[in-house]
């Protein structure tokens, strides 16, 4: 249930940039100090550093994206404002974890968050992307962050907790097959073809779940485009 983590990061990998959307729990804002609005800083009697300097430090100290193991991308701030936490259904919240015998926590009761949108532009499409969150002195994630990654709108994974480092191998031809090197950071529907065999008292039922894009490799479906199936094509 990482979608119930106090902090949420949605990472959108696009053709020429990475778009980072953050919901920062009100009690964890200090960890993301370089995103605190200038008005808030001035109210405390302190003059904030220039935005360019704060974004540079955010890119190197707080939320890092490293492409092809060598280039650290520079963040640009798009929007920072107060909001209420977005509701993300978690069917496991409140249930008992069979391994720990502890109740699975839901989202924080305090719904106040600092909402932030940032972009990290790049000039050439990278083959790998390493994601590094804010770290503690011991080298672990400083605060719990539930995260999800999309590449050109395709979910690369399900919600998971962001570890101290996560390396993603990118497939630009078909983002469905982009993969994290860590096995615990994967989508439940990992393959484009999944078969379910149901054995019941009076029947055996075989169900096949296949992506349209993979099915087109076997037969011509006569679809007009690659992104959408028109109503008339059903």
Task: Map each language-model feature to its residues.
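N-terminal soluble domains immediately following signal/targeting peptides that reside
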Residues: 1-234
């Amino acid at each position: 249930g990482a979608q119930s983590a106090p902090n949420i990061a949605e990472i959108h990998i696009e053709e020429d940039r990475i778009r980072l959307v953050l919901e920062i729990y009100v009690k964890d804002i200090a960890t993301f100090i370089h995103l605190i609005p200038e008005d808030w800083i001035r109210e405390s009697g302190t003059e904030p550093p220039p935005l360019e300097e704060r974004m540079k430090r955010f890119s190197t100290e707080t939320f890092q994206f490293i492409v092809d193991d060598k280039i650290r991308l520079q963040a640009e701030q798009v929007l920072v404002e107060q909001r209420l936490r977005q509701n993300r259904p978690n069917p496991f919240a409140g249930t008992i974890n069979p391994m720990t015998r502890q109740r699975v926590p839901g989202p924080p009761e305090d719904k106040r968050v600092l909402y932030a949108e940032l972009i990290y532009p790049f000039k050439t499409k990278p083959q790998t992307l390493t994601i590094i969150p804010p770290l503690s002195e011991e080298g672990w994630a400083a605060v719990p962050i539930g995260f999800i990654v999309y590449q050109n709108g395709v979910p690369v994974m399900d919600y998971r907790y962001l570890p101290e480092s996560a390396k993603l191998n990118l497939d630009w031809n078909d983002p469905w097959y982009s993969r994290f090197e860590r096995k615990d950071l994967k989508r439940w529907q990992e393959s484009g073809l999944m078969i379910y065999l149901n054995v019941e008292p009076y029947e055996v039922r075989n169900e096949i779940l296949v992506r349209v894009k993979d099915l087109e490799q076997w037969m011509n479906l006569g679809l007009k485009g690659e992104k959408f199936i028109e109503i008339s094509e059903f």
